[in-house]
């Protein structure tokens, strides 16, 4: 779902769903942003313009995206908290390639497709899983979950991990209490998910 917002100087390629995009759209509209579509991709663009890279902290969903900022010349890559949507990257002479699937990334050629032996060890040890940033191919890496990568015009890059799970035990609630809380959350989640299951715009 590529989209260009000439007014903001931003271009985005987006794969995924932002479940709370309607609420964010209303919030951004109230702050003066004008929308020309009903898609969550445009909400991503407006949110990026409003909050910068911290826009991901407002998103609930599964997503991978790239935003090109014409003003700064930066490319910003982002991935959802749990890494549900993939984002593969490959550094080739004079360019950085990215795609949401390996076949798409490899289609242009010129990428080292030798097997990464460390990744192969992980694959065999962790029941068919290769932890980020490695992939089974030496010339391809994947953006880790909950990561924003900023690629500068000179080719340098910087990663920001915007979320990490917490595992602190809450001793004030029993297992039954947690089950009840979870049951109360589900109807709202279902409504949020159903709202984004809409026909794709032509």
Predicted regions and their residues:
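Cysteine-centered catalytic environments shared across enzyme families
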Residues: 1-202
């Amino acid at each position: 779902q590529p989209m260009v917002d000439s007014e903001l100087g931003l271009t985005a390629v987006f794969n995924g769903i932002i479940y709370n995009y309607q609420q964010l759209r209303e919030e951004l509209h109230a702050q003066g942003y004008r929308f020309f579509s009903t898609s969550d991709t445009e909400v991503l663009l407006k949110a990026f313009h409003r909050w910068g890279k911290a826009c991901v902290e407002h998103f609930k969903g599964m997503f991978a995206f790239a935003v090109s900022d014409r003003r700064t010349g930066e490319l910003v890559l982002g991935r959802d908290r749990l890494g549900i949507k993939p984002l593969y990257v490959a550094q080739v002479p004079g360019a950085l390639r990215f795609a949401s699937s390996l076949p798409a990334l490899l289609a242009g050629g010129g990428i080292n497709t030798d097997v990464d032996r460390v990744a192969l060890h992980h694959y065999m040890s962790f029941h068919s899983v290769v932890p980020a940033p490695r992939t089974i191919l030496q010339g391809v890496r994947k953006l880790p979950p909950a990561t924003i990568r900023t690629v500068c015009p000179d080719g340098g890059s910087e990663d920001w991990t915007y979320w990490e799970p917490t595992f602190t035990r809450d001793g004030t609630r029993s297992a039954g209490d947690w089950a009840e809380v979870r049951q109360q959350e589900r109807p709202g989640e279902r409504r949020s998910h159903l709202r984004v299951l809409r026909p794709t715009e032509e």
